[in-house]
Amino acid sequence: MPELPEVEVVRRGLERWAAHRTVADVEVLHPRAVRRHVAGPDDFAHRLKDHRIGTPSRRGKYLWLPLEDTDQAVLAHLGMSGQLLVQPHETPAEKHLRIRVRFADALGTELRFVDQRTFGGLSLHDTSADGLPDVIAHIARDPLDPLFDDEAFHHALRRKRTTIKRALLDQSLISGVGNIYADEALWRARLHYERPTATLTRPRTTELLGHVRDVMNAALAVGGTSFDSLYVNVNGESGYFDRSLDAYGREGMPCRRCATPMRRRPWMNRSSYFCPKCQRPPRVTP
C-alpha cells in the first residue's frame, strides 16, 4: 500500500496536471470504485460536473482534490493498487480503468483512476473550515507537516504503553508511516521494533523522528518505492527508492552498518526486517 512519499509524489503530479481545471464529465466504469460515495455513481458524477478542481492536498496517506467555491472535496483512497493517471484522450483505456474524468479545456488530457484489485476508490465529502475532509478528521498530522508537534508526539508515545513500530503505524498518533518506512527509520535509529514506547527518552524520540523525515524525504527525491507496476506516479512512472532500502526486504543480506545478516520476523500479518546486532531486542523482565 502506498505510504506518504508515494502519495505525495502523486499529489505533486496532480497539482501540476489537474489543478485549476474544470470537470466536463465523469464516467464511472465500476461501481466499487465509488462505493464509499453512498449516494452512488450517478450522484458522484453529477456533483463533480462543472466544478473546478483546487490545489490537491494530503495528510499522511490520504489525498484529496478540493472543489473550488464549495465546502467539498474528492477523497482518493488508493488501497493496494489504485493509480491516478493523467493521460492523453487518445491513450487506450487501461485494463483496470474504473473512473474517467474529462476536463472542459483544450489540453488534451484526462484524469483516470485505475485499480486492479478494486480496494481503493474515490468519494465526495464535506470539508471542515481548514479544508480537511470530515471522514479523516481523526487522522493525525504527518511528520512532514510543518504543524506536526514533536513534543506532543513524544508525550503521546510515553502514555501509549505500546511498542515503537505499532506506534509509528498508529494513524491517531502519526500518519503516513507504513511498514516499509517504519522498518527503515527504526534501522537508522538502531531501535528494535518491539521496543516499548515508555522507554523512549525525549532525545531518542527526536532522533527517531529525524530518521523518519530523512527516509521519507530521500524516498520523495526519487519518486517513492515501487516493488511492482502497481505503484506509479500520474505519468505512469515508477519510483526507485527500493534500490536504496537499508532494512525492508533485505532478509539474509548483510547489514549495511555491521555486515550481520538481516532478519525478518512475522509481525501483525506483515513482516519486520531488522539487524539482530544493531537493533537489540528489549530485555524481557521476569
From Swiss-Prot:
Binds 1 zinc ion per subunit. Keywords: DNA damage, DNA repair, DNA-binding, Glycosidase, Hydrolase, Lyase, Metal-binding, Multifunctional enzyme, Zinc, Zinc-finger. Its EC number is 3.2.2.23, 4.2.99.18. It catalyses: Hydrolysis of DNA containing ring-opened 7-methylguanine residues, releasing 2,6-diamino-4-hydroxy-5-(N-methyl)formamidopyrimidine; 2'-deoxyribonucleotide-(2'-deoxyribose 5'-phosphate)-2'-deoxyribonucleotide-DNA = a 3'-end 2'-deoxyribonucleotide-(2,3-dehydro-2,3-deoxyribose 5'-phosphate)-DNA + a 5'-end 5'-phospho-2'-deoxyribonucleoside-DNA + H(+). The keyword Acyltransferase does not apply. The active site is at residues 2-3, 61, 270. Monomer. PROSITE patterns: FPG_CAT (PS51068), ZF_FPG_1 (PS01242), ZF_FPG_2 (PS51066). DNA binds at residues 96, 117, 160. SUPFAM superfamilies: Glucocorticoid receptor-like (DNA-binding domain), N-terminal domain of MutM-like DNA repair proteins, S13-like H2TH domain. The gene is mutM. SMART domains: Fapy_DNA_glyco, H2TH. One of its GO terms (biological process) is base-excision repair. A zinc finger (FPG-type) spans 246-280. The keyword Zinc applies. Its cofactor is Zn(2+). Involved in base excision repair of DNA damaged by oxidation or by mutagenic agents. Acts as a DNA glycosylase that recognizes and removes damaged bases. Has a preference for oxidized purines, such as 7,8-dihydro-8-oxoguanine (8-oxoG). Has AP (apurinic/apyrimidinic) lyase activity and introduces nicks in the DNA strand. Cleaves the DNA backbone by beta-delta elimination to generate a single-strand break at the site of the removed base with both 3'- and 5'-phosphates. Belongs to the FPG family. This is Formamidopyrimidine-DNA glycosylase. It comes from the Bacteria. NCBIfam families: fpg, PRK01103.1. GO terms for molecular function: 8-oxo-7,8-dihydroguanine DNA N-glycosylase activity; class I DNA-(apurinic or apyrimidinic site) endonuclease activity; damaged DNA binding; DNA-(apurinic or apyrimidinic site) endonuclease activity; zinc ion binding.
